[in-house]
């Protein structure tokens, strides 16, 4: 009886376990499945997976829907590929999906594409894919039947998933399907928010089709892969993968494994990344599918580029899944993972499945949340039809239509301009506009807005232009707004509002009723307040005079960078009649000054200057609109006839050129050199990517990189700077300007300016920073002048980084970062602009090198390789050796 009850209990437990697994396999509560291009409000359950797909109409506000060419609508084609939504209008079009679980969770996000000649043009497109405001990947379609899948694992920082398609003028972007799957929080744990799928293979898979849901509870797609001279093993019993660290690879995948036929061979997976700086995580899934006899052993080690990555050998467990993975991301020009048989093993290595992901580091900050909430409220209130989806200000090149933003350092972008003219707006001016506190320009003209002009518009202190023409506004103009207009602090346009009263009597009449109620207590209050104000004023006056009568020391604190105009007499006073010269350049002399107890640098235009007023004006106009911690701040300027001056923040430690030339006795350490280079690179990156249109500095050199008392570097001297076209097709063929040695040879030849001209110059500066040598030096053997790029190129062939690094550093430098920075510098200084990296890439490399130097990386010289020259991806291929 006891035996019978125990047997019944076992049977019940088995049935219950199977039931739980079936229920779990059917659970789609963490799924969002969208078929792009099917009619609005339609849905269906996929015949193969039973996943419910819905129309994309509720998740996107733009685009047109199409069916693919009937020629490609075969019975075997997944239903999601039979329709598409294309986006022929606008540079950026976004899907906005709100998963039920919201932010803080980890999701697998997948986009799928099949062209199918839906437009009958026979031209497969090429476009970019963004997740929110950061680039995810590029989508290249080879032909009508090519299926492209892009997958990313991402932890949400907001409640919304924004998937955006960006037009590159290489065909119309489109999308076939968008799928979002909730993952366990303990799955794919890394310090990074996003991992892009590189490869996911079912090794030794017996089927011809990929494995996915319901076999995989997370609906990962496993591609079967088999190799010649490899044995495939198939488990006779089911592999347990449910307790596998949360990964839970599909049981069908884990039931098969592959191993070399040659018992002495290893398994090798290797690939050469397109970019050697890309970082990868690799997850290898193992299960012994054959019960081994007692005299057989399967044991192996896992090596990366011939170095062990696990401290001990590994033996897969019979019918149980284990996952081995790297704790830290790996990178390099070539990555090779080897499963190496140990001496005591009688059997070769075995593997069931492998996943490889590339780290996607999101460098762009999202738009200020208050601004986002405000503009979304405005969109909802007025039903704005402008395809306002995704981040309003990011990416930098693709802000929302009719929105302009400011981009300062690493801070969140801010909305500074909103144009809603002729947008069919009705009702009153919404209070949400008051939360756009950095707004400079607001255009609400030619709508049907009613009611009064709200008082809060007068409190937007940054607002310099307000256009309310052509509406149905009524009542009086707010007093503050009228006062600001009278003081020419704001350009106020209100024509075309017949019921709007603009006379002074309106203001008096409007305020009279309010004031009469409070007039008696107000008079009594005013007397008391005036007395208090007078007392405070006298106290502050005393304090100010007392401070001035003290030591007279000059503060080293932060400056007030509010730009203002100064009279020439004030400039004379600031410089104490031009007492102390700090330096001299083509513009004129630079003098030391004191302004409001702060040190400043005052650049005076020489009347004999060859640069003159044009460069003066260019620098003033540029510095008035750009703000970044690595660009010198303009405090003010003077222009009285031929007398012109620029007042900057004071940079106590001179220029980078002073240190490299030996003019200063202090020798910059290796870490200080890297940090100064990073500072300068960040300043240039802001000019190139944070300004719209991009700005080219045109004269990047050590003398134009200033250093403050904290050894923080800032780019200076913008008199030669120019804006260039956003699309990169700049046709500026003005006279070539710059400094010999740093001047881009391609720009000098073609006279066509682009950001890559700055990158060339910065590469030369980097070589000077690394070597401590001048840009042009005379050869000891031929007595000819040799450029630093030629000298370094020659020394690279020796394979000894010590021959390149500044000898004043001795052995006090990190060889790994020295190699990296030298390679980056040489790539920047390539004679062809096409081979030069972007400043964003340079900044990323420098950040990594700074981190390495601070962590005390090894100082030994590495072998001579040039990862920057690796420009292909050979895929990831297993080999038996």
Swiss-Prot record:
Glycans are attached at residues 143, 234, 295, 310, 404, 419, 435, 446, 462. Residues 576-850 form the Protein kinase domain. One of its GO terms (cellular component) is plasma membrane. The chain crosses the membrane at residues 519-539. Residues 26-518 are extracellular. LRR repeats lie at residues 438-460, 462-483. It catalyses: L-seryl-[protein] + ATP = O-phospho-L-seryl-[protein] + ADP + H(+); L-threonyl-[protein] + ATP = O-phospho-L-threonyl-[protein] + ADP + H(+). Residues 1-25 form the signal peptide. It is found in: Cell membrane. The modification Phosphotyrosine is found at residues 648, 747. Belongs to the protein kinase superfamily. Ser/Thr protein kinase family. This is Putative leucine-rich repeat receptor-like protein kinase At2g19210. It comes from Arabidopsis thaliana. The lineage of its organism: Eukaryota, Viridiplantae, Streptophyta, Embryophyta, Tracheophyta.
């Amino acid at each position: 009886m006891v035996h019978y009850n125990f047997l019944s209990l076992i049977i019940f437990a088995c049935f219950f376990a199977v039931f739980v697994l079936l229920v779990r396999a059917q659970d789609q509560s963490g799924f969002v499945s969208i078929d792009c291009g099917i009619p609005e409000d339609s849905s269906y359950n996929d015949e193969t997976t039973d996943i419910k797909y819905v129309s994309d109409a509720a998740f996107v506000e733009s685009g047109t829907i199409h069916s693919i060419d009937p020629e490609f609508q075969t019975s075997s084609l997944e239903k999601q590929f039979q329709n598409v939504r294309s986006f022929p209008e606008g540079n950026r079009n976004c899907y906005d999906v709100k998963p039920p679980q919201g932010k803080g969770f980890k999701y697998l996000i997948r986009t799928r594409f099949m062209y199918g000649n839906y437009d009958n043009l026979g031209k497969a497109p090429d476009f970019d894919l963004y997740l929110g405001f950061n680039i995810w990947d590029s989508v290249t379609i080879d032909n009508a039947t090519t299926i492209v899948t892009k997958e990313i694992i991402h932890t949400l920082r907001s409640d919304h998933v924004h998937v955006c398609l960006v037009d590159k003028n290489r065909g119309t972007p489109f999308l076939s399907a968008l799928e979002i799957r909730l993952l366990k929080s303990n799955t794919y744990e890394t310090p990074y928010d996003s991992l892009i799928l590189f490869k996911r293979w079912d090794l030794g898979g017996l089927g011809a089709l990929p494995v996915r849901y319901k076999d995989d509870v997370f609906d990962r797609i496993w591609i079967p892969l088999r190799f010649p001279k490899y044995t495939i093993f198939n488990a006779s019993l089911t592999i347990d993968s449910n307790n596998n660290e949360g990964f839970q690879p599909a049981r069908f995948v884990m039931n098969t494994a592959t191993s070399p036929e040659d018992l002495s061979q290893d398994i090798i997976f290797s690939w050469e990344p397109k970019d050697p700086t890309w970082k990868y995580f690799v997850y290898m899934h193992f299960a012994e599918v054959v019960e081994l006899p007692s005299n057989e052993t399967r044991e192996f080690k896992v090596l990366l580029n011939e170095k062990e990555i696990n401290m001990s050998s590994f033996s897969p467990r019979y019918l149980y899944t284990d996952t081995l993975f790297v704790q830290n991301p790996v990178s390099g020009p070539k990555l090779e993972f080897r499963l190496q048989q140990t001496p005591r093993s009688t059997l070769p290595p075995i593997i069931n499945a492998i996943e490889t992901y590339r780290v996607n580091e999101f460098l762009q900050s999202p738009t200020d949340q208050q601004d986002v909430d405000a503009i979304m409220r405005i969109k909802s209130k007025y039903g704005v039809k402008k395809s306002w989806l995704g981040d309003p200000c990011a990416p930098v090149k693709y802000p929302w239509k009719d929105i302009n933003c400011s981009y300062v350092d690493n801070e969140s972008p801010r909305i500074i301009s909103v144009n809603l003219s002729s947008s069919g707006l009705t009702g009153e001016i919404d209070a949400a506009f008051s939360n756009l506190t950095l707004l400079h320009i607001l255009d609400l003209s030619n709508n049907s807005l009613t009611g009064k002009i709200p008082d809060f518009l007068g409190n937007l202190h940054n607002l310099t232009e307000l256009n309310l023409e052509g509406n149905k506004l009524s009542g009086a103009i707010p007093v503050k707004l009228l006062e600001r207009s009278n003081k020419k602090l704001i350009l106020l346009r209100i024509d075309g509002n017949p019921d709007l009263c603009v006379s002074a009597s309106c203001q008096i009449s409007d305020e009279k009723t309010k004031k009469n109620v409070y007039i008696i207590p107000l008079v009594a209050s005013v007397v008391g307040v005036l007395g208090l104000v007078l007392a405070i004023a006298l106290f502050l006056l005393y304090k100010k005079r007392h401070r001035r009568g003290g030591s007279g020391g000059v503060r080293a604190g932060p400056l007030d960078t509010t730009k203002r105009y100064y009279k020439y007499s004030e400039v004379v006073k600031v410089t104490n009649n031009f007492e102390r010269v700090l330096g001299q350049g083509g513009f004129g002399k630079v003098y030391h000054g004191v302004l409001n107890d702060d040190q400043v640098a005052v650049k005076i235009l020489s009347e004999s200057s060859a640069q003159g007023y044009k460069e003066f004006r260019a620098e003033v106009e540029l510095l008035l609109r750009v703000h970044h911690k690595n660009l010198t701040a303009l405090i003010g300027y003077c222009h009285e006839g031929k007398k012109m001056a620029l007042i900057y923040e004071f940079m106590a430690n001179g220029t980078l050129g002073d240190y490299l030339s030996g003019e200063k006795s202090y020798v910059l350490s290796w870490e200080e050199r890297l940090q100064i280079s990073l500072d300068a690179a960040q300043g240039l990156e802001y000019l190139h990517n944070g300004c719209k249109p991009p700005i080219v500095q045109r004269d990047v050199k050590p003398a134009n990189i200033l250093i403050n008392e904290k050894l923080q570097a800032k780019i200076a001297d913008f008199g030669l700077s120019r804006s260039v076209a956003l699309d990169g097709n700049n046709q500026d063929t003005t006279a070539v300007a710059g400094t010999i040695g740093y001047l881009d040879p391609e720009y000098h030849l073609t006279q066509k300016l682009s950001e890559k001209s700055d990158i060339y110059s910065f590469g030369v500066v980097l070589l000077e920073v690394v070597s401590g040598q001048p840009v042009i030096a005379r050869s000891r053997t031929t007595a000819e002048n040799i450029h630093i790029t030629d000298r370094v190129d020659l020394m690279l062939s020796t394979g000894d980084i010590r021959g390149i690094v500044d000898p004043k550093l001795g052995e006090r430098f990190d060889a790994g970062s020295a190699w990296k920075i030298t390679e980056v510098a040489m790539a920047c200084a390539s004679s062809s602009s096409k081979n030069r990296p972007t400043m964003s890439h340079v900044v990323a490399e420098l950040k990594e090198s700074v981190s390495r130097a601070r962590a005390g990386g090894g100082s030994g010289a590495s072998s001579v390789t040039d990862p920057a020259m690796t420009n292909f991806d050979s895929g990831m291929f297993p080999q038996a050796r």
